[in-house]
């Protein structure tokens, strides 16, 4: 397996990206990494550490797409950027999955222009994993589509259900529509129509869910528009950091609590791993005709390492093929109904 990595995308590139890749290959097996970007800068970082040269290679790209760039213009004009080159290598099957911490708009635009949508998919979406009382849940869409049509919600639910089944092994994922109330008929007209479409879909749709239901793990897949999903995701990350540091502060308040903290040291590490955004970072763009993973622009080396390992596991699944097949089946069903 070859993981294509945009070495120049993100606030902390290329240092955090390259070091994260080095950490990933030292911790996990089963994949190679092709770093795409300025070869001189990448090699300078690589030379500071010892690593298995058979597992990390470089593909030079002379340009960088920054957060200041207009997505469509950047994809069309910066042909030798690390992001565009990465997409082209993926399309040419020179790699199995592409990972970038770069400009989100450009990543979406590049995925659509170069890879294209899976046939039948109207709008791709980001699926972000978050910790819940039940284990883990998926927020979809987590930031790509700020305005959605009813059919988009339906397709998000289908793709999210397949992802959770293939990635986490949940046999029949429960899917809920994020709304202002759990009762049928809640929300605006778009959400009401989305509810009807989801109800008719071949997934385990359990109805509307409210914001508090997400953390309680009442569903495995939370369907929403990208604006709402991104706000929910960022709140999740901020709240996790706040509560962990709040507990940590209380535990270190005095001698008595410090003694208790010493006994709970291992448990605190488990808690940190559950609540830490660096542990849960990285999300697939579902619906494009290729495996693409997005991570925060602020990703550090630890985040990148974790995302690469997660991306490698995603590439091992049959999620992309299953999504393709599901939309083929839906198209056949629509034709049969028309007849």
Swiss-Prot record:
Protein name according to UniProt: Phosphate acyltransferase
Similarity remark: Belongs to the PlsX family.
Subcellular location: Cytoplasm
Organism: Acetivibrio thermocellus (strain ATCC 27405 / DSM 1237 / JCM 9322 / NBRC 103400 / NCIMB 10682 / NRRL B-4536 / VPI 7372) (Clostridium thermocellum)
Gene3D superfamilies named in the record: Isopropylmalate Dehydrogenase
Pathway the protein contributes to: Lipid metabolism; phospholipid metabolism
A GO biological process held by the record: fatty acid biosynthetic process
Keyword line: Cytoplasm, Lipid biosynthesis, Lipid metabolism, Phospholipid biosynthesis, Phospholipid metabolism, Transferase
GO MF annotation terms: phosphate:acyl-[acyl carrier protein] acyltransferase activity
Documented EC number(s): 2.3.1.274
Function in brief: Catalyzes the reversible formation of acyl-phosphate (acyl-PO(4)) from acyl-[acyl-carrier-protein] (acyl-ACP). This enzyme utilizes acyl-ACP as fatty acyl donor, but not acyl-CoA.
Subunit details: Homodimer. Probably interacts with PlsY.
GO CC field: cytoplasm
Catalytic activity: a fatty acyl-[ACP] + phosphate = an acyl phosphate + holo-[ACP]
